[in-house]
Amino acid sequence: MLHTTQLYQHVPETRWPIVYSPRYNITFMGLEKLHPFDAGKWGKVINFLKEEKLLSDSMLVEAREASEEDLLVVHTRRYLNELKWSFAVATITEIPPVIFLPNFLVQRKVLRPLRTQTGGTIMAGKLAVERGWAINVGGGFHHCSSDRGGGFCAYADITLAIKFLFERVEGISRATIIDLDAHQGNGHERDFMDDKRVYIMDVYNRHIYPGDRFAKQAIRRKVELEWGTEDDEYLDKVERNIKKSLQEHLPDVVVYNAGTDILEGDRLGGLSISPAGIVKRDELVFRMVRGRRVPILMVTSGGYQKRTARIIADSILNLFGLGLIGPESPSVSAQNSDTPLLPPAVP
């Protein structure tokens, strides 16, 4: 029997399927500055979209925090109990001083924002199926699996979103994960190792964290990149491999992990993709997936420079300008794009 969740509630048509909460952002006594991740980037993305007059607060879907019962759909109770120790959270978030904080503060200031982003991804999964597309402005914690975290990822939001859909939404039984963050997505790979319903395509720098050889066995389409890969080679490989992926396994939903740590100058990603290249990448993914009438859920994942928030906002603006997203994106897209799009589903 399914547990009662607050994450699968009806959303009025007046709201776009863009999920966000001010509670996403991590700020506490400057500790967030000790990690290269911009722990306030999610709010900056929304502010840029407001400045460009694309969105207002009344058009957004407010993310809810994932409850313990929600998390237990994927996570072991033992793992969730480990997060009650500040040492474990310090290791996962790679912020050593967290060790010295009382765990009630760690829960409130670090883990609650991550649980809220996780709830946002689960909510966006349902919205994607109903509307044809959805974006969680946070999430994409692709290094976390059911029983282990790492790489700033404490909850397995991608796995959770897919499992919620499989369990609760009729007609959703096949999923594809397109993971274009610079790092291998070893968390969801471990979770779906033996699940043939889930097809994983992963494009990543082969030389960097996590280098999880066991998890690589779950990747159905693996594209390993060299240091400093640039736009032309990257976009060509992404386009060709998405096309092949969708031919091999036509899913009922795509989860797109849209990390911006592929950006040139990102010292953790080690690739050399331009801002325009990232915008073009997202356009390619949406055009190819939506052109096949497959719902798409986008999460923002990694991105370790201050300018990534602007790039994410520019990408969302570009998707809107091309008619690939919008309040009535199927009809908008028919006018502005050469790709047929998904009609609105009945909730």
UniProtKB/Swiss-Prot annotation:
Look up keyword Repressor and say if it applies: yes
Secretion signal, residue range per the UniProt entry? none
Reaction(s) catalysed by this chain's protein:
N(6)-acetyl-L-lysyl-[histone] + H2O = L-lysyl-[histone] + acetate
Q: Annotated region Histone deacetylase: where?
A: 14-326
Subcellular compartments: Nucleus
Question: Which tissues does the record link to its expression?
Answer: Weakly expressed in most tissues. Strongly expressed in brain, heart, skeletal muscle, kidney and testis.
Q: Which Pfam families does the annotation name? A: Hist_deacetyl
What is the E.C. number? 3.5.1.98
Gene Ontology terms: cellular component: histone deacetylase complex; nucleus; plasma membrane
Q: Which GO terms describe its biological process?
A: chromatin organization; epigenetic regulation of gene expression
Active-site residues from the entry: 143
GO terms, molecular function? DNA-binding transcription factor binding; histone deacetylase activity; histone deacetylase activity, hydrolytic mechanism
Classify the source by domain of life.
Eukaryota
InterPro entries noted in UniProt: HDAC_classIV, HDAC_PDAC, His_deacetylse, His_deacetylse_dom, His_deacetylse_dom_sf, Ureohydrolase_dom_sf
Q: Which UniProt keywords apply?
A: Chromatin regulator, Hydrolase, Nucleus, Repressor, Transcription, Transcription regulation
Oligomer and partners: Interacts with HDAC6.
Q: Which family does it belong to?
A: Belongs to the histone deacetylase family.
What additional remark is attached to this entry?
Its activity is inhibited by trapoxin, a known histone deacetylase inhibitor.
Q: Describe its function.
A: Responsible for the deacetylation of lysine residues on the N-terminal part of the core histones (H2A, H2B, H3 and H4). Histone deacetylation gives a tag for epigenetic repression and plays an important role in transcriptional regulation, cell cycle progression and developmental events. Histone deacetylases act via the formation of large multiprotein complexes.
Q: What is this protein called?
A: Histone deacetylase 11
Name the species this protein comes from.
Homo sapiens
Query: Lineage of the source organism?
Result: Eukaryota, Metazoa, Chordata, Craniata, Vertebrata
